[in-house]
């Protein structure tokens, strides 16, 4: 019979054997990786004259000639990787020439076949490479695979590749539909994916803003965040009354950003929206774009029941120069609402600390009223900035 000690020794030997086997596998993988990198470096050196030829003739109108002679699978991938690297760097006719070379070398066709592989990893790599080559020939098979695929990493790689390869807005529209149909949060990724395309997507985004699919509407609003044109105002005003609070929030933010088109009364009226998230977004946007006419509305918002609305209102007031800071001081002294007073004091404290930190810079601005001097007008002489912690703060949620 085996004793407990024998069993323990046997167990230790088994563990050591497994550890040794695992270390051996890791060493083999590392060695294989080193060998592969050396082979790739050697092949890059071998085909350097061809790469020089491509660089010298990149601006010529004539198409590139494919490499002469048969290529091994590894040689094909090495050249393909170099071409994909250049495709990302170039634009216009130069990019089109490099993409045409990929098609002439049957690289696009090779990866199109890999899309139907039974192995997930091969599909992923093929989708990535097709996007890197930006060939219009890859759009249809990529979209077909998107229609079959469930939500996951491959779906997002396929969507990004479609965006890179698409030649028509209809193709991008189908891609957006397939990307956002699985999960509500995918509209965030969809808006980011659209940045990969070389097409002008503004007409597509305007179309999506009228769509019944809320995810497509959100995608369009996120993708249009940097635009404040007058042409968007009618659609945004309609979406500002949407039942979906996320759509309403995004639309209101964009309208506030384009505040020169709308009366300030309209903007400030959104501070009474039933959704606290939207009221907070409006309060935040008012400060970012410096609408001093909204100071009374922001002061009133300091009494809001939502902590984030009070926080962004106080922060926005602090961003509106002397007038905003005076309003904060007045709110801090008023006793009608403790939440308003505490939030105002908390923001005053942060602003004074910030001014103290940048004191040397502020001294260079001649004639400017510092927030410290305004503070002293309302609260008297402060002994030192670090001791201002005693003025309190709003910590209610």
Where are these regions (language model features)?
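N-terminal signal-anchor transmembrane alpha helix of single-pass membrane proteins
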Residues: 1-41
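Structural detector for internal amphipathic alpha-helices that build alpha-solenoid repeat scaffolds
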Residues: 85, 92-102, 124-134, 155-167, ...
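Amphipathic alpha-helical scaffolding segments comprising HEAT/armadillo-like alpha-solenoid repeats
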Residues: 99-115, 135-147, 167-179, 199-210, ...
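N-terminal topogenic membrane-targeting module
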Residues: 31-116
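Long, contiguous interaction/recruitment modules in multidomain scaffold/adaptor proteins
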Residues: 24-39, 143, 147-198, 203, ...
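HEAT/HEAT-like alpha-solenoid repeats
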Residues: 138-139, 143-146, 182, 246, ...
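Short inter-helical turns and helix N-cap capping residues of alpha-solenoid HEAT/ARM repeat scaffolds
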Residues: 118-119, 149-154, 182-184, 212-214, ...
């Amino acid at each position: 019979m085996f004793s407990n000690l024998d069993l323990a020794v046997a167990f230790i030997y088994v563990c050591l054997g497994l550890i040794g086997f695992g270390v051996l596998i890791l060493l083999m993988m590392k060695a294989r990786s080193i060998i592969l990198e050396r082979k790739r470096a050697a092949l890059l050196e071998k085909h350097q004259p061809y790469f020089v030829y491509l660089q010298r003739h990149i601006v010529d109108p004539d198409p590139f000639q494919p490499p002469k002679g048969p290529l091994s699978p590894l040689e094909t991938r090495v050249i393909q990787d170099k071409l994909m690297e250049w495709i990302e760097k170039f634009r216009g006719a130069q990019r089109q020439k490099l993409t045409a070379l990929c098609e002439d070398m049957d690289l696009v066709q090779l990866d199109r076949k890999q899309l139907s592989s039974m192995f997930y990893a091969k599909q992923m790599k093929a989708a990535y490479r097709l996007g890197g080559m930006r060939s219009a020939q890859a759009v249809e098979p990529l979209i077909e695979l998107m229609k079959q695929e469930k939500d996951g990493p491959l779906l997002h790689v396929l969507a990004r590749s479609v965006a890179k390869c698409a030649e028509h807005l209809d193709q991008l529209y189908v891609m957006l539909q397939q990307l956002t149909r699985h999960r509500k949060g995918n509209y965030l990724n969809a808006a980011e994916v659209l940045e990969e395309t070389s097409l002008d997507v503004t007409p597509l985004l305007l179309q999506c803003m009228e769509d019944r699919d809320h995810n497509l509407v959100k995608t369009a609003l996120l993708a249009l965040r940097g635009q404040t044109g007058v042409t968007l105002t009618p659609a945004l005003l309609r979406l500002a009354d949407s039942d979906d609070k996320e759509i309403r929030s995004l639309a209101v933010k964009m309208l506030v950003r384009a505040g020169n088109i709308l009366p300030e009364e309209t903007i400030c009226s959104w501070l009474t929206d039933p959704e606290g998230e939207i009221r907070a977004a409006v309060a935040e946007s008012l400060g970012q774009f410096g609408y001093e006419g909204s100071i009374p509305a922001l002061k009133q918002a300091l009494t809001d029941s939502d902590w984030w609305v009070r926080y962004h209102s106080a922060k926005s007031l602090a961003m509106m120069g002397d007038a905003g800071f005076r309003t904060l001081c007045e709110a801090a002294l008023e006793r009608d609402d403790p939440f308003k007073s505490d939030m105002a004091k908390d923001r005053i404290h942060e602003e004074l600390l910030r001014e103290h930190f940048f004191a040397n810079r502020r001294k260079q601005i001649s004639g400017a009223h510092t927030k410290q001097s305004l503070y002293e007008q309302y609260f008297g002489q402060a002994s030192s900035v670090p001791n201002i912690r005693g003025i309190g703060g709003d910590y209610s949620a």
